[in-house]
């Protein structure tokens, strides 16, 4: 399959990730604990994967840092899904295409075109509407702040992966999941949560199983695609998560989604779409060489 198709599949799976997060929360793994359990399972499985392949665990420094930042973004995103409305969290995470465009222009030497200005303006305008509702006052809770930080970490990580040289997906998954676990441990420490938690120990085991069967495949698809697609292109393809995440959140959780939220969502999607209007950017890597 092509990188575009695999990135789209990853987006659909990311869009449904709130379901296991909320399910584990119901079992007693609140805050960052659900993400920590799943990422721990993904790390154990990816490390075993590398051992079986006997792959050298020495990726280029830039690729390793990029994978680690994606891991930070994964943990921030999982915590955001537990602390905020799924619809708002998913939409605010998708300021990532705007951050990606700025990073490409400032650090990767790609040109700034009129669609870039449209992407940035539409994304920021959409975020203001989603946060403020009536566009007169910004209201950002912990979930929204974590979602914004997650999108920024993702954008920087994707840019570093794209420009850091080719590395096997298994090795990158080790760095991504290990970083996600480390970030989750920081959250747990800040929250003063006992580790491992006494009551939901079985839930931790179930979370680790979900990490092996769900998170690891999605991470592998994501980091593999990130090395082959320009950051803004990848972020655009992953906006399929908006459709999946928002629709599933509205239909299954009955979360509020009024006219202002709909307009904000449309602006964010427009910002992502505008980046690919002039044509495919799969060959953007050539501009960096």
Labelled PLM ranges:
Residues 24, 34, 80, 92, ...:
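Hydrophobic/aromatic residues within transmembrane alpha-helices
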Residues 50-51, 79, 96-118, 243-262:
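C-terminal transmembrane-helix exit sites in multi-pass transporters
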Residues 15, 19, 47, 67, ...:
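Hydrophobic/small/kink-forming positions within alpha-helical transmembrane segments
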Residues 115-133, 260-278:
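Hydrophobic transmembrane alpha-helices of multi-pass small-molecule transport proteins
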Residues 2-10, 50-76, 120, 142-150, ...:
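Loop-to-transmembrane-helix transition segments
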Residues 5, 37, 90-95, 161-179, ...:
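Helix-helix packing/entry segments at the starts of transmembrane helices
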Residues 7, 11-23, 46, 100-101, ...:
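Transmembrane alpha-helical segments that form core, pore/gating elements
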Residues 42-59, 72, 124-138, 179-205, ...:
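Membrane-interface helix-cap regions at the ends of transmembrane helices
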């Amino acid at each position: 399959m092509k990188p575009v198709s695999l990135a789209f599949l990853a987006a659909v799976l990311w869009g449904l990730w709130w379901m296991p997060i909320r399910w584990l929360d119901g079992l007693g793994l609140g805050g960052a604990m659900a993400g920590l359990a799943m990422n721990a399972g993904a790390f154990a499985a990816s490390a075993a994967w590398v051992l079986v392949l006997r792959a050298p665990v020495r990726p280029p420094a830039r690729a390793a840092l990029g994978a680690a930042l994606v891991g930070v973004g994964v943990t921030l995103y999982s915590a955001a899904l537990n602390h905020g409305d799924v619809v708002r969290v998913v939409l605010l995470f998708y300021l990532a295409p705007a951050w990606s465009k700025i990073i490409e222009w400032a650090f990767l030497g790609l040109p700034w075109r009129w669609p870039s200005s449209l992407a940035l303006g539409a994304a920021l305008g959409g975020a203001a509407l989603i946060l403020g509702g009536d566009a007169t006052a910004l209201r950002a809770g912990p979930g929204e702040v974590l979602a914004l930080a997650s999108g920024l970490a993702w954008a920087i990580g994707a840019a570093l992966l794209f420009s850091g040289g080719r590395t096997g997906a298994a090795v990158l998954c080790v760095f991504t999941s290990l970083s996600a676990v480390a970030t989750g441990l920081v959250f747990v420490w800040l929250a003063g949560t006992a580790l491992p938690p006494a009551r939901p120990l079985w839930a931790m085991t179930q979370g680790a199983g979900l990490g092996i069967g769900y998170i690891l495949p999605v991470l592998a698809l994501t980091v593999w695609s990130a090395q082959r697609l320009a950051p803004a292109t990848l972020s655009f393809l992953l906006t399929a998560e908006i459709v999946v995440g928002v629709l599933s959140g509205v239909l299954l959780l009955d979360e509020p989604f009024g006219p202002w939220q709909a307009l904000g969502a449309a602006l964010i999607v427009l910002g992502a779409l505008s980046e690919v209007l002039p044509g495919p950017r799969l060959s953007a890597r050539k501009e960096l060489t």
